[in-house]
UniProtKB/Swiss-Prot annotation:
Lineage: Bacteria, Pseudomonadati, Pseudomonadota, Betaproteobacteria, Rhodocyclales
First-tier enzyme category under EC: lyase
Protein name, UniProt field: Imidazoleglycerol-phosphate dehydratase
Catalytic activity: D-erythro-1-(imidazol-4-yl)glycerol 3-phosphate = 3-(imidazol-4-yl)-2-oxopropyl phosphate + H2O
Protein's UniProt keywords contain Ubl conjugation: no
Subcellular location: Cytoplasm
Gene: hisB
Length: 195
């Protein structure tokens, strides 16, 4: 069973993330940041992962710590659920459009954290959500899941559409990379023999 539950408890946040990599897209979120909940739902539904994330944070200051720490905790949960990564595809990619917006996401469960984020949003906020926090979410995930992640917003006039295509593509790319590869069942997907 490729499942994990991780709790992160700091002076800034308390977060619990549950993930089932072989789920069906069931989702439950209560992070205190409504737009983040909406984006997490994209990951669950387009990745076909069952995700349950609960967070309490110092949102009276701003949403930064909560958004970043949700990324950290979700990354830890993915790393734990994947274990030694034996038998997975390892690489995943997706292009996702939403009206005028188009984004590309490529992921490698390499064990080497690296975020390559090329997004120029058309405005600084989506409702009350600071678009800079999307990068903080992905940086937290990358550092704690041990993945190399390339995110490119190829076009878009609407910042909400840009962000949503990124999170949808991220879910689809994760799904592809985390899928079991029946042709390489039981093998570590690396010539090194370890990831």
């Amino acid at each position: 069973m490729r499942q994990a539950e991780v709790t992160r408890d700091t002076l800034e946040t308390r977060i619990t993330a549950r993930v089932d990599l072989d789920g069906s897209g069931k989702a439950a979120f209560a992070t205190g940041v409504p737009f983040l909940d909406h984006m997490l739902d994209q990951i669950a539904r387009h990745g076909a992962f069952d995700l349950d994330i609960r967070a309490e944070g110092d949102t009276h200051i701003d949403d930064h710590h909560t958004v970043e720490d949700v990324g950290i905790t979700l990354g830890q949960a993915f790393a734990r659920a994947l274990g030694d990564k034996r038998g997975i595809r390892r690489y995943g990619h997706a292009y996702v459009p939403l009206d005028e917006a188009l984004s590309r996401v490529v992921v490698d469960f390499s064990g080497r954290p690296g975020l390559h984020y090329f997004v120029s949003y058309t405005r600084a906020r989506i409702g009350s959500f600071d678009v800079d926090l999307a990068r903080e979410f992905f940086q937290g995930f990358v550092n704690h899941a041990g993945v190399t992640l390339h995110i490119d917003s190829l076009r878009g006039d609407n910042a909400h559409h840009q962000c949503e295509t990124i999170f949808k593509a991220f879910g689809r790319a994760l799904r592809m990379a985390a899928e079991r590869d029946e042709r390489a069942a039981g093998a570590i997907p690396s010539t090194k023999g370890a990831l």
